[in-house]
Amino acid sequence: MKYLTDEKLLIVGAGGMIGSNMAQTALMLGLTPNVCLYDIFEPGVHGVAEEMYHCAFEGANITWTVDPAEAFKDAKYIISSGGAPRKEGMTREDLLKGNCQIAAQFGDYIKEYCPDVKHVVVIFNPADVTALTALIHSGLKPSQLTSLAALDSTRLQSNLAKEFGVPQSKVTAAYTYGGHGEAMAVFASKTLIDGTPLAEKNLSAERWAEIKHATVQGGSAIIKLRGRSSFQSPAYNAVKMIEADMGGTKFTWPAGCYVNCDECGFKNVMMAMPTVIDVAGVHFTKPEGTPEEMAELQASYEHLCKMRDEIVSLGIVPPVDEWKKSNPNL
């Protein structure tokens, strides 16, 4: 089997549903034979490792551990789902304090054991703030750490495809930006449905509002249907993000990235933007939309600022003007 690289990929939270799916997806896509599975729950991560062995992936070197020093040492790529999952009735923001404390420790492990890591993807919620926490603590460059945000856009794409009875790939330029949560901003002014602008499809305002609501509540809908939070879609998209940095297909769905941009008017947050991930990391451009879309994005940014300020007040990260002491790259 041919692999993109032989460098070490670390899956954090590998004993869980997302983590185990990430491990299998990474090996099925041929990212690297050297995959380390890490979790604090030994029976879970041991069980996942055994299942991976039973898949008999050609040339694979799968290891597992509950020791962070062993796990993080020499890791060049990391995906972390190592936080508490969302349960029915919870918002992503409800997970803020506990998961940001986990993210702080995660960032500290990176700084201590694998400062030469190439790219890190954080996918445990609230992803914008856990990723920001990890970035501050890790010392990495902003281009080296991203958070999963693509699911909001793929859910929008899926909802529009179902609405108009077209293959999902025929819905283009349907994106969400800003926060990965209730305050996400939906951008559809440039959306095409099989080549036809959405604005020309005679969609009523009421129906469009329903589609937007279904997009924002897409994760909650999965919990109600399956009794647990999403795991297959986040696992696949997170692995595709890492694949892009390894030199595979560029990842062009929106990713959460660090934004400190006077031109954009957004300062010191992680948020979903128009992005590309490639071997040089993540790059963003300024979003373009209608005045209404830009107002939604501004509101989403302000919500992210409030969550950022909350983790500062909790002492999980230092005040913004002291971030450079923790991470000179910010």
Where are these regions (language model features)?
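Rossmann-like NAD(P)-binding element
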Residues: 55-119
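Conserved N-terminal Rossmann-fold NAD(P) cofactor-binding segment
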Residues: 6, 31-75, 309-311, 316
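C-terminal substrate-binding/catalytic lobe of Rossmann-fold NAD(P)-dependent dehydrogenases
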Residues: 138-143, 153-330
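Rossmann-like NAD(P)(H) cofactor-binding subdomain of soluble oxidoreductases
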Residues: 91-159
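N-terminal Rossmann-fold NAD(P) dinucleotide-binding loop
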Residues: 19-20
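Conserved S-adenosyl-L-methionine
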Residues: 28-34, 139-142
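A short, basic/flexible loop-to-alpha-helix module at the beginning of a structural domain
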Residues: 1-7
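Conserved glycine-rich cofactor-binding loop
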Residues: 15
